[in-house]
Amino acid sequence: MTLRTINAKDAASLDRDLMNEGGFSLDQLMELAGLSVSQAVYRVHPPSKGRNVLVACGPGNNGGDGLVAARHLAHYGYKPTVYYPKQGKNELYERLKTQLHNLSVPFTSDFLGSLQTSDLVIDAIFGFSFSGPLRDPFPKVISLMEETQVPVLSVDAPSSWDIEAGPPKEGPGAKFMPQTLISLTAAKPLVKWFKGRHFLGGRFLTKGVVERYGLDIPEYPGVEQIVEVDVNGEGKL
């Protein structure tokens, strides 16, 4: 069975529906997304594999998901370090940073140096709303994630990938294939290029929303906020 996906326009519409008629706030959606990311990390990279996690955050909501995930990981016993070179304007991001500071989670401006001592990288730079071109410092950061032997988990999309067309034909990200991808709420069309472990996160959709957008939402086991889903991606770059 081919996994049904949702394009960028419908993903944005779905978020608006959740916050309008659904009654969710942005804070809630970001908290649920970040919790899902943290559970995916625990599933593929338990603390026994290494506790040093580098969380690369972009300026938008994808970066906010990364900040939330870092907080949860700190409570799980990991040692997250956050790379957050360009903070978004929403005051929510400042509050998320305060929560991390209160847990003594370090922030770094040296991505390469932190990468060299990390056991896992969370790519929370760009999500479903990304459109190029890449701006500094992110081309270099994406190239480093592309080249590293450290496993990478991408949030909603491997950064630099187009939501519809997948990886760029050339430049940073053209050969970027993270080991793990967690799609938030629903998978995006880019999953057909992905080859790795794929999770779905975001256990809060109503039956009406699922039917309206024609989504495939598998059953979540127990109290889990994530479910592993095979995308049968070609994975050829």
From Swiss-Prot:
Key word Isomerase present: yes
Catalytic function, reaction form: (6R)-NADHX = (6S)-NADHX; (6R)-NADPHX = (6S)-NADPHX
Cofactors: K(+)
Annotated InterPro entries: YjeF_N_dom, YjeF_N_dom_sf, YJEFN_prot_NAXE-like
PROSITE patterns documented for this protein: YJEF_N
Cofactor detail note: Binds 1 potassium ion per subunit.
This protein's GO CC annotations: mitochondrion
The organism's place on the tree of life at top rank: Eukaryota
Listed EC numbers: 5.1.99.6
Protein's cellular compartments: Cytoplasm; Mitochondrion
Job description of the protein: Catalyzes the epimerization of the S- and R-forms of NAD(P)HX, a damaged form of NAD(P)H that is a result of enzymatic or heat-dependent hydration. This is a prerequisite for the S-specific NAD(P)H-hydrate dehydratase to allow the repair of both epimers of NAD(P)HX.
Family of this protein: Belongs to the NnrE/AIBP family.
Cross-referenced HAMAP family: NADHX_epimerase
Protein name stated in the entry: NAD(P)H-hydrate epimerase
Taxonomic placement: Eukaryota, Fungi, Dikarya, Ascomycota, Pezizomycotina
